[in-house]
């Protein structure tokens, strides 16, 4: 035990920790040391670096992302977006046409373009209705009337993470289109991380905006066919 060095009373706990078999009853002093080490480990939290929107843009300018990379910034983390399937693409394109019809000069339909919603957040909703196209900058929450997320494989993430961030940013209305259950969820009344009101629409229903006047269409017109044509 001389390898521990120091006086006898100093090296005893060290040697006991190293030599006591895992499945034996540990002496009280070892239990106390182990307990103290466990407390320290619990108190040392793993800290992640959160990129700002400015840093995120500089990464893009530096060529870290290619033009084909589909990424967005959520809570300071660069998140790779899932590939777009035919149902997702069909629904987004159809919604674009349906939302554009009543738009005229009232708002602008933005398709899969970024919004800056916080210092650490730049998501790319599938669609967004903007009051206008801001010059010289990306749209911010004050420019947005509503956002739309079309979900198939990303339902949980879109609902629990992205909609929560839209609510925190104060975006008045957010739609979640669940392609698997063929439903529209219209969320309104943003609060701290959650929308206070939710209205659901399915096949046979007429989808209506909670905040944008005269914005309505039949759900059947926006939901993809059961099987691809051809």
Language-model features: locations:
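Secreted/extracellular small peptides and ectodomain modules produced from precursors
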Residues: 2, 12-13
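Serine residues within intrinsically disordered or low-complexity segments
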Residues: 2-3, 19
């Amino acid at each position: 035990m001389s390898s521990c060095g120091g006086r006898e009373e100093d090296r005893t706990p060290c040697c006991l920790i190293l030599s006591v078999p895992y499945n034996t009853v540990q002496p009280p002093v070892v239990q106390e040391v182990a307990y103290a080490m466990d407390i320290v480990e619990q108190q040392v939290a793993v800290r992640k670096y959160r990129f700002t929107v400015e840093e995120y843009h500089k990464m893009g300018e530096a060529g870290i992302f290619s033009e084909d990379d589909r990424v967005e910034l959520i809570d300071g983390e660069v998140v790779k977006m899932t590939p777009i399937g035919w149902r997702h693409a069909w629904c987004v394109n159809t919604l674009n046409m349906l939302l554009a019809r009543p738009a005229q000069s009232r708002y602008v339909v933005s398709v899969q373009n970024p919004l800056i919603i916080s210092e650490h957040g730049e998501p790319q909703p599938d669609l967004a209705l903007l009051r206008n196209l801001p010059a010289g900058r990306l749209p911010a929450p004050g420019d947005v009337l509503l956002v739309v997320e079309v979900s198939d494989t990303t339902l949980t993430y879109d609902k629990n993470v992205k909609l929560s961030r839209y609510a925190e940013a104060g975006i008045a209305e957010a739609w979640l289109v669940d392609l698997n259950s063929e439903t529209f969820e219209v969320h309104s009344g943003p609060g701290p991380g959650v929308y206070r009101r939710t209205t659901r629409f399915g096949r046979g229903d007429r989808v209506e905006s909670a905040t944008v006047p005269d914005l309505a269409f039949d759900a059947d017109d926006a939901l993809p066919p059961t099987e691809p044509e051809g």
